[in-house]
């Protein structure tokens, strides 16, 4: 039996209404109608099992049958800040994989060597990717992708995390042991041009530990997935063989 289709809505009470793109997808693509059951999500971590009560021209009314807590969220808060890339598909890939791996907070930023800049439409697109990825991997929470105009702004947004990792291609060795992490963790990965020495110094002054991902130079999107995977495994989020570590932000 396949899992029920999942949709994000703004508000849920005893009833809920699907509108906009979610409605169009439910009605015109999935051909859902009266009597069909779905799962609605309001980004609170809860999952609402609902039944379609009526379908109008531009909306779908659903009655709530039951509510439960989602069980796919990571126990340890993890954040990823990445340098915004020129290639839109690569930015979407980073967001998609971060969501699939369980990241709670995502920040795109511009830095000294960045050659691409964000606008409202691009940010909206990344948030749509976040929601679609959350639905695909059965998460009950879709991280809101935020944009920081400077690296410093991004670093300051991550000050509440217990572990702060700064992936740096010219770091000779890691200042933190990413294999034995405990508690909430923030990661920062640069854009195509990487970071300057001054940016590394800034990060270090704000409590970030420089880390290396090995002797080979990785593409930015590869570095994001690699570091996120390492961190999630270290925190016990990718298998029973690693130690579970909880943290708060």
Language-model region placement:
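N-terminal positively charged helical leader segments and presequences
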Residues: 1-70
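Glycine/charged-rich beta-loop-alpha catalytic/anionic-binding loops adjacent to active sites
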Residues: 16-18, 75-79, 184-186, 205-213
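Generic structural signal for residues in well-ordered beta-strands
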Residues: 62, 142-146, 210
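Short, ordered loop/turn segments at secondary-structure junctions
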Residues: 67, 111-114, 215-216
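RNA substrate-binding interface of SAM-dependent RNA methyltransferases
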Residues: 71-165
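Active-site/ligand-binding-proximal alpha/beta "capping" segment
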Residues: 161-201, 208-211
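Structured adenosyl-cofactor binding patch, chiefly the S-adenosyl-L-methionine
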Residues: 197-249
